[in-house]
Swiss-Prot record:
Its main location: endoplasmic reticulum. The lineage of its organism: Eukaryota, Metazoa, Chordata, Craniata, Vertebrata. This is Receptor expression-enhancing protein 3. The chain crosses the membrane at residues 1-21, 35-55, 59-79. PANTHER family: HVA22-LIKE PROTEINS (PTHR12300), RECEPTOR EXPRESSION-ENHANCING PROTEIN 3 (PTHR12300:SF39). Expressed in circumvallate papillae. Keywords: Cell cycle, Cell division, Endoplasmic reticulum, Membrane, Microtubule, Mitosis, Phosphoprotein, Transmembrane, Transmembrane helix. The gene is REEP3. The modification Phosphothreonine is found at residue 201. Belongs to the DP1 family. The keyword Repressor does not apply. GO terms for cellular component: cytoplasmic microtubule; endoplasmic reticulum membrane; endoplasmic reticulum tubular network. It is a multi-pass membrane protein. It comes from Homo sapiens. The keyword Protease does not apply. GO terms for biological process: cell division; endoplasmic reticulum tubular network organization; mitotic nuclear membrane reassembly; nuclear envelope organization.
Protein backbone atom coordinates (compact mmCIF):
# COMPACT_ATOMS: atom_id res chain seq x y z
CA UNK A 1 0.00 0.00 0.00
CA UNK A 2 2.83 2.38 0.88
CA UNK A 3 4.69 1.45 -2.30
CA UNK A 4 1.56 2.19 -4.36
CA UNK A 5 1.15 5.65 -2.80
CA UNK A 6 4.81 6.56 -3.26
CA UNK A 7 4.87 5.37 -6.87
CA UNK A 8 1.68 7.29 -7.63
CA UNK A 9 3.09 10.51 -6.14
CA UNK A 10 6.35 10.15 -8.09
CA UNK A 11 4.48 9.58 -11.36
CA UNK A 12 2.27 12.64 -10.83
CA UNK A 13 5.05 15.02 -9.78
CA UNK A 14 8.03 13.90 -11.87
CA UNK A 15 6.18 12.26 -14.69
CA UNK A 16 3.52 14.95 -15.37
CA UNK A 17 3.95 18.27 -13.52
CA UNK A 18 7.69 18.72 -14.11
CA UNK A 19 7.53 17.93 -17.88
CA UNK A 20 4.42 20.11 -18.25
CA UNK A 21 6.23 23.14 -16.83
CA UNK A 22 9.27 22.70 -19.12
CA UNK A 23 6.99 22.20 -22.09
CA UNK A 24 5.43 25.59 -21.28
CA UNK A 25 8.90 27.20 -21.22
CA UNK A 26 9.80 25.58 -24.55
CA UNK A 27 6.67 26.99 -26.18
CA UNK A 28 7.26 30.42 -24.63
CA UNK A 29 10.91 30.71 -25.72
CA UNK A 30 10.25 29.02 -29.08
CA UNK A 31 13.25 26.78 -28.57
CA UNK A 32 12.86 24.12 -31.26
CA UNK A 33 15.32 21.70 -29.67
CA UNK A 34 13.49 21.69 -26.31
CA UNK A 35 10.15 21.64 -28.07
CA UNK A 36 11.05 18.45 -29.98
CA UNK A 37 12.49 16.86 -26.86
CA UNK A 38 9.35 17.33 -24.80
CA UNK A 39 7.06 16.33 -27.66
CA UNK A 40 8.89 13.00 -27.88
CA UNK A 41 8.57 12.61 -24.11
CA UNK A 42 4.79 13.15 -24.16
CA UNK A 43 4.33 10.60 -26.94
CA UNK A 44 6.27 7.99 -24.95
CA UNK A 45 4.50 8.88 -21.70
CA UNK A 46 1.07 8.45 -23.38
CA UNK A 47 2.08 4.92 -24.41
CA UNK A 48 3.37 4.30 -20.87
CA UNK A 49 0.01 5.38 -19.38
CA UNK A 50 -1.87 2.85 -21.55
CA UNK A 51 0.51 0.02 -20.61
CA UNK A 52 0.38 1.00 -16.92
CA UNK A 53 -3.43 0.81 -16.84
CA UNK A 54 -3.37 -2.75 -18.18
CA UNK A 55 -0.43 -3.81 -16.00
CA UNK A 56 -2.06 -2.55 -12.78
CA UNK A 57 -4.92 -5.01 -13.37
CA UNK A 58 -2.77 -7.99 -14.36
CA UNK A 59 0.79 -7.99 -12.95
CA UNK A 60 0.42 -5.72 -9.90
CA UNK A 61 1.13 -8.75 -7.69
CA UNK A 62 4.68 -9.05 -9.14
CA UNK A 63 7.37 -8.28 -6.51
CA UNK A 64 8.91 -4.82 -6.74
CA UNK A 65 6.30 -3.81 -9.32
CA UNK A 66 5.77 -0.25 -7.97
CA UNK A 67 9.53 0.26 -7.48
CA UNK A 68 10.08 -0.65 -11.12
CA UNK A 69 7.48 1.93 -12.16
CA UNK A 70 9.28 4.66 -10.21
CA UNK A 71 12.62 3.73 -11.76
CA UNK A 72 11.17 3.65 -15.29
CA UNK A 73 9.62 7.13 -14.99
CA UNK A 74 12.89 8.61 -13.71
CA UNK A 75 14.79 6.89 -16.57
CA UNK A 76 12.41 8.45 -19.13
CA UNK A 77 12.73 11.93 -17.61
CA UNK A 78 16.43 12.07 -16.80
CA UNK A 79 18.51 14.29 -19.14
CA UNK A 80 21.46 11.91 -18.73
CA UNK A 81 19.76 8.74 -19.87
CA UNK A 82 17.30 10.38 -22.31
CA UNK A 83 15.10 7.33 -22.13
CA UNK A 84 12.09 8.98 -23.82
CA UNK A 85 14.16 10.09 -26.85
CA UNK A 86 15.72 6.65 -27.12
CA UNK A 87 12.40 4.75 -27.08
CA UNK A 88 10.85 7.15 -29.57
CA UNK A 89 13.69 7.01 -32.12
CA UNK A 90 14.38 3.28 -31.86
CA UNK A 91 10.85 1.88 -31.64
CA UNK A 92 7.94 4.30 -31.92
CA UNK A 93 8.97 6.41 -34.89
CA UNK A 94 9.67 3.43 -37.24
CA UNK A 95 6.47 1.69 -36.10
CA UNK A 96 4.25 4.75 -36.57
CA UNK A 97 5.81 5.54 -39.96
CA UNK A 98 5.03 2.06 -41.29
CA UNK A 99 1.47 1.97 -39.94
CA UNK A 100 0.56 5.63 -40.43
CA UNK A 101 -1.73 5.16 -43.46
CA UNK A 102 -3.62 2.28 -41.88
CA UNK A 103 -4.04 4.21 -38.66
CA UNK A 104 -5.43 7.20 -40.59
CA UNK A 105 -7.93 4.96 -42.40
CA UNK A 106 -9.07 3.44 -39.12
CA UNK A 107 -9.56 6.89 -37.63
CA UNK A 108 -11.67 8.05 -40.61
CA UNK A 109 -13.81 4.90 -40.48
CA UNK A 110 -14.24 5.28 -36.75
CA UNK A 111 -15.46 8.86 -37.23
CA UNK A 112 -17.98 7.87 -39.91
CA UNK A 113 -19.26 4.85 -38.03
CA UNK A 114 -19.38 6.80 -34.81
CA UNK A 115 -21.52 9.49 -36.48
CA UNK A 116 -23.87 6.89 -37.98
CA UNK A 117 -24.08 5.07 -34.68
CA UNK A 118 -24.97 8.27 -32.85
CA UNK A 119 -27.68 9.08 -35.43
CA UNK A 120 -29.15 5.57 -35.12
CA UNK A 121 -29.15 5.73 -31.35
CA UNK A 122 -30.80 9.14 -31.50
CA UNK A 123 -33.56 7.87 -33.81
CA UNK A 124 -34.18 4.85 -31.63
CA UNK A 125 -34.36 7.06 -28.56
CA UNK A 126 -36.89 9.37 -30.23
CA UNK A 127 -39.00 6.40 -31.36
CA UNK A 128 -39.01 4.94 -27.87
CA UNK A 129 -39.98 8.30 -26.37
CA UNK A 130 -42.82 8.79 -28.88
CA UNK A 131 -44.10 5.25 -28.30
CA UNK A 132 -44.04 5.74 -24.54
CA UNK A 133 -45.92 9.04 -24.85
CA UNK A 134 -48.63 7.52 -27.09
CA UNK A 135 -49.02 4.52 -24.79
CA UNK A 136 -49.38 6.75 -21.74
CA UNK A 137 -51.98 8.90 -23.52
CA UNK A 138 -54.03 5.85 -24.57
CA UNK A 139 -53.93 4.40 -21.06
CA UNK A 140 -55.00 7.68 -19.48
CA UNK A 141 -57.86 8.05 -21.99
CA UNK A 142 -59.04 4.52 -21.25
CA UNK A 143 -58.95 5.20 -17.52
CA UNK A 144 -61.03 8.36 -17.94
CA UNK A 145 -63.54 6.51 -20.13
CA UNK A 146 -63.95 3.74 -17.59
CA UNK A 147 -64.38 6.31 -14.85
CA UNK A 148 -67.16 8.05 -16.75
CA UNK A 149 -68.88 4.75 -17.48
CA UNK A 150 -68.87 3.90 -13.79
CA UNK A 151 -71.21 6.81 -13.09
CA UNK A 152 -74.93 6.01 -13.28
CA UNK A 153 -77.52 8.31 -14.78
CA UNK A 154 -78.73 9.18 -11.29
CA UNK A 155 -75.24 10.33 -10.29
CA UNK A 156 -74.99 12.52 -13.37
CA UNK A 157 -78.38 14.16 -12.82
CA UNK A 158 -77.67 14.94 -9.17
CA UNK A 159 -74.74 17.19 -10.05
CA UNK A 160 -75.98 20.74 -9.67
CA UNK A 161 -75.12 23.41 -12.18
CA UNK A 162 -73.84 21.04 -14.89
CA UNK A 163 -76.87 21.37 -17.19
CA UNK A 164 -76.81 24.02 -19.89
CA UNK A 165 -79.07 27.01 -19.37
CA UNK A 166 -81.40 26.10 -22.24
CA UNK A 167 -81.89 22.55 -20.98
CA UNK A 168 -82.76 23.33 -17.36
CA UNK A 169 -86.37 22.49 -16.42
CA UNK A 170 -88.82 25.38 -16.04
CA UNK A 171 -89.83 26.03 -12.46
CA UNK A 172 -93.35 27.51 -12.17
CA UNK A 173 -93.99 30.36 -9.81
CA UNK A 174 -95.68 29.57 -6.49
CA UNK A 175 -99.40 29.98 -6.24
CA UNK A 176 -99.00 32.71 -3.62
CA UNK A 177 -97.15 34.95 -6.08
CA UNK A 178 -99.81 34.35 -8.74
CA UNK A 179 -102.62 35.27 -6.37
CA UNK A 180 -100.85 38.40 -5.13
CA UNK A 181 -101.16 40.09 -8.54
CA UNK A 182 -104.36 42.25 -8.73
CA UNK A 183 -106.88 41.68 -11.48
CA UNK A 184 -106.70 44.31 -14.22
CA UNK A 185 -110.49 44.75 -14.24
CA UNK A 186 -110.74 45.71 -10.55
CA UNK A 187 -110.24 49.18 -9.16
CA UNK A 188 -107.74 49.66 -6.33
CA UNK A 189 -110.07 51.91 -4.33
CA UNK A 190 -113.65 50.57 -4.56
CA UNK A 191 -113.59 47.30 -6.48
CA UNK A 192 -115.61 48.86 -9.35
CA UNK A 193 -114.74 47.34 -12.73
CA UNK A 194 -113.51 49.74 -15.34
CA UNK A 195 -113.72 49.58 -19.06
CA UNK A 196 -110.67 49.40 -21.24
CA UNK A 197 -111.07 52.96 -22.53
CA UNK A 198 -111.51 54.59 -19.08
CA UNK A 199 -108.58 56.17 -17.33
CA UNK A 200 -108.14 56.12 -13.58
CA UNK A 201 -107.64 59.43 -11.88
CA UNK A 202 -105.31 59.96 -8.95
CA UNK A 203 -108.24 60.24 -6.58
CA UNK A 204 -109.60 56.87 -7.66
CA UNK A 205 -106.20 55.23 -7.22
CA UNK A 206 -105.62 56.68 -3.78
CA UNK A 207 -109.19 56.27 -2.49
CA UNK A 208 -111.24 58.71 -0.34
CA UNK A 209 -109.90 60.06 2.91
CA UNK A 210 -113.21 60.28 4.87
CA UNK A 211 -116.83 59.20 4.82
CA UNK A 212 -118.06 62.58 3.46
CA UNK A 213 -115.63 62.42 0.59
CA UNK A 214 -116.72 58.84 -0.13
CA UNK A 215 -120.37 59.91 -0.34
CA UNK A 216 -119.49 62.86 -2.54
CA UNK A 217 -117.44 60.68 -4.81
CA UNK A 218 -120.28 58.16 -5.14
CA UNK A 219 -122.66 60.98 -6.04
CA UNK A 220 -120.36 62.14 -8.74
CA UNK A 221 -120.04 58.65 -10.10
CA UNK A 222 -123.80 58.41 -10.56
CA UNK A 223 -123.96 61.56 -12.70
CA UNK A 224 -121.62 60.65 -15.52
CA UNK A 225 -122.44 63.72 -17.60
CA UNK A 226 -121.54 66.11 -14.80
CA UNK A 227 -118.27 64.27 -14.16
CA UNK A 228 -117.24 64.31 -17.79
CA UNK A 229 -117.92 68.05 -18.07
CA UNK A 230 -116.20 69.03 -14.84
CA UNK A 231 -113.17 66.81 -15.28
CA UNK A 232 -112.71 68.02 -18.85
CA UNK A 233 -112.74 71.67 -17.81
CA UNK A 234 -110.87 71.23 -14.57
CA UNK A 235 -107.86 69.23 -15.80
CA UNK A 236 -104.75 70.91 -17.02
CA UNK A 237 -102.17 69.04 -18.98
CA UNK A 238 -98.51 69.99 -18.83
CA UNK A 239 -96.12 68.36 -21.24
CA UNK A 240 -92.40 68.03 -20.64
CA UNK A 241 -90.96 66.63 -23.81
CA UNK A 242 -92.35 63.18 -24.28
CA UNK A 243 -93.82 62.94 -20.73
CA UNK A 244 -97.40 63.89 -19.93
CA UNK A 245 -98.04 65.18 -16.45
CA UNK A 246 -101.62 65.41 -15.15
CA UNK A 247 -102.37 67.94 -12.47
CA UNK A 248 -104.33 66.67 -9.52
CA UNK A 249 -107.55 68.45 -8.82
CA UNK A 250 -110.26 67.42 -6.48
CA UNK A 251 -113.79 67.41 -7.84
CA UNK A 252 -116.07 70.23 -6.81
CA UNK A 253 -119.01 69.46 -4.58
CA UNK A 254 -122.43 70.85 -5.52
CA UNK A 255 -125.27 70.99 -3.04
Amino acid sequence: MVSWMISRAVVLVFGMLYPAYYSYKAVKTKNVKEYVRWMMYWIVFALYTVIETVADQTVAWFPLYYELKIAFVIWLLSPYTKGASLIYRKFLHPLLSSKEREIDDYIVQAKERGYETMVNFGRQGLNLAATAAVTAAVKSQGAITERLRSFSMHDLTTIQGDEPVGQRPYQPLPEAKKKSKPAPSESAGYGIPLKDGDEKTDEEAEGPYSDNEMLTHKGLRRSQSMKSVKTTKGRKEVRYGSLKYKVKKRPQVYF
